[in-house]
A protein has these predicted regions:
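Glycine-rich loops and low-complexity Gly/Arg-rich segments
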Residues: 33-36, 91-94, 283-287, 328-331, ...
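Hydrophobic, ordered structural segments
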Residues: 69-89, 317-339
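Conserved short beta-strand edge segments in small beta-sheet-based binding/regulatory domains
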Residues: 88-103, 336-352
Length: 416
C-alpha cells in the first residue's frame, strides 16, 4: 500500500488580487460542498484545503495563497493534476509568477517550485490508502447487510460458526474476496528510508550529547527568564471571525483546523521551535505512526509548516468531533506537547519552563486558537468516517484472514 505525503504549496498573491481571490474561493467552496469539485478529482486525496494566508506588515510579508493536501504516494501525478485543473488554475493565476496561458508543464513546474517543506507531520496510520479506506467501509456495509438476514446464519451457531459463515460469504463475492488477504504495508523503499531516519538521528546526536545537553539547559534557563516578560493575547475573537470559521465546521464527522501565528522574535525562540518540531516529527514518524498521537486517537493528519525564514508557522489538522472536544483532548492529554511548540508563538498563554501552564489556561488557550484560525475551502474524501471507524474497519478485515476461536470471534463480531 502507498505511504502518505503531506503536500504544501504556497505563493504570494499579486498586488490587488485579494477580492478576486476571495470570489474564486467562494465559487470553489460551493462546488466542493456540492460534489467535491476539482479537489475530489485529484489523485490519492484523503483531505485537501485552499486558503489565503494573511500578510504581515510588521514583517513586510504580503498575502499568499496556500494549498494543503494529504495524499497517497506517488506525489507527481497529484501535482500534475493540480496544475492542470482549470478552476484551481484560476486561483493560482492570482499569484506572482504563475505562467498565465502557459503549458501544463510550465504550470506543474510552477507548482513544484512553490512547494514548502513540512517541518512536522502526523499520519494516523501510515500505509492506509484512501482506496483501502473506501473498500473497507464497503466491506463493513456488505457484511452488515448479509447479517440482516437471519437465514444466512447457522441456527444457534457459535460465534466461531457465525464468523465462518461471514468468511464464506466474503469468499463467494469476487468483489469482496480481496478482504481475505491482509492489507499490505508501505513499500520497501519507504520502510528502508524510515528505518534509516530512525537510526541516523540518535546516532548523530548521541556523540554530541556532552555539548547539546548543557546548551539545552542554558537555553531553557534563558527561555524561563523571557517567559516572565511575555505578554499573552487576552482579546476574544470577534463574532464575525467565529462565524466565518464555524461556517466550515460540523458538516460531517471530520473537521478541519487551520491556524497560523508569528514566532516570538529572537534567535532563541526560532531555534527552540525548530528543535521542538524536529523532535515531534521524529516521535510522530517512529513512535506514533499507528492509531494515536500521544493518546489522542481523533486526529487523521496534522502538520506544522515553518514559513518566512522561520518567522511564522502554520498548523493544520483533520480531526473528529467538535472543536471544543478537540481542544479539550490536547489540554487533558498532551498540554506539554502543545506548549512545547505553541509557546514560541506571540500572544500564547503564559508558560513556565516551556512546557508548563500555557494550554492549562483553558479560556485563554481556546481564545488564542480561535483568533489565529483561518477559514479554508476544505475537502474530505471520507468525511463521515472517524479515525476510530477506520481502525475498526481495518480490524474487521484483518479478522477475515483465518479461522477464529469462539472468544476471538465474539470480540470480532462486537465490531459489527
Amino acid at each position: 500500500m502507498p505511504h502518505q505525503i503531506l503536500v504544501t504549496v504556497r505563493a504570494p498573491l499579486k498586488p490587488g488580487r485579494g477580492p478576486e481571490t476571495a470570489h474564486l474561493l467562494e465559487a470553489l467552496r460551493k462546488t466542493v460542498e456540492h460534489d467535491g469539485g476539482p479537489l475530489a478529482q485529484l489523485p490519492g486525496v484523503h483531505f485537501a484545503r485552499v486558503f489565503v494566508l494573511p500578510g504581515d506588515d510588521e514583517l513586510d510579508i504580503t498575502d499568499s495563497l496556500v494549498y494543503l493536501s494529504e495524499i497517497d504516494a506517488p506525489q507527481r501525478p497529484h501535482l500534475r493534476a493540480l496544475a492542470a485543473d482549470g478552476e484551481l488554475g484560476a486561483l493560482f493565476a492570482q499569484c506572482v509568477g504563475y505562467p498565465d496561458g502557459g503549458s501544463r508543464r510550465a504550470a506543474a513546474r510552477w507548482v513544484r517550485q512553490h512547494q514548502v517543506r513540512v517541518a512536522t507531520r502526523y499520519v494516523h496510520t501510515v500505509g492506509r490508502g484512501v482506496d483501502q479506506v473506501r473498500d473497507e467501509a464497503r466491506l463493513r456495509a456488505e457484511i452488515e447487510t448479509f447479517l440482516d438476514d437471519p437465514a444466512h446464519l447457522p441456527v444457534g451457531g457459535s460465534p466461531a460458526e457465525v464468523h465462518e459463515a461471514i468468511r464464506r460469504f466474503v469468499a463467494g463475492r469476487p468483489d469482496l474476496a480481496w478482504a481475505l488477504r491482509p492489507a499490505a504495508g508501505p513499500g520497501l523503499a519507504f520502510r528502508a528510508r524510515e528505518l534509516l531516519h530512525a537510526v541516523a538521528w540518535p546516532a548523530l546526536l548521541l556523540p554530541l550529547a556532552p555539548v547539546l545537553l548543557p546548551a539545552a539547559v542554558l537555553g531553557l534557563l534563558a527561555i524561563r527568564r523571557r517567559e516572565s516578560r511575555d505578554v499573552p493575547e487576552t482579546e476574544r475573537p470577534t463574532s464575525a471571525h467565529v462565524a466565518t470559521i464555524t461556517r466550515g465546521e460540523d458538516h460531517g464527522t471530520v473537521n478541519p483546523f487551520t491556524a497560523y501565528g508569528q514566532v516570538k522574535v529572537g534567535l532563541l525562540r526560532r531555534t527552540t521551535i525548530v528543535v521542538a518540531l524536529r523532535g515531534l516529527d521524529y516521535a510522530a514518524r517512529h513512535w506514533y505512526s499507528r492509531d494515536n498521537l500521544a493518546g489522542v486517537r481523533s486526529i487523521h493528519f496534522a502538520r506544522w509548516v515553518l514559513l518566512d525564514g522561520g518567522r511564522r508557522v502554520i498548523f493544520a489538522s483533520d480531526y473528529d468531533g467538535s472543536q471544543e472536544s478537540y481542544m479539550d483532548d490536547f489540554i487533558d492529554r498532551i498540554a506539554w506537547g502543545v506548549n512545547l511548540v505553541f509557546s514560541n508563538g506571540r500572544g500564547y498563554p503564559p508558560t513556565r519552563w516551556l512546557i508548563k501552564d500555557g494550554a492549562r489556561y483553558e479560556e485563554l488557550y481556546k481564545r488564542y486558537l480561535r483568533r489565529h484560525q483561518l477559514p479554508s475551502v476544505w475537502f474530505a474524501a471520507c468525511g463521515d468516517l472517524s479515525a476510530r471507524n477506520l481502525d475498526d474497519n481495518a480490524v474487521l478485515r484483518a479478522g477475515l484472514a483465518g479461522e477464529l476461536t469462539d472468544e476471538e470471534a465474539r470480540t470480532w463480531l462486537a465490531l459489527l
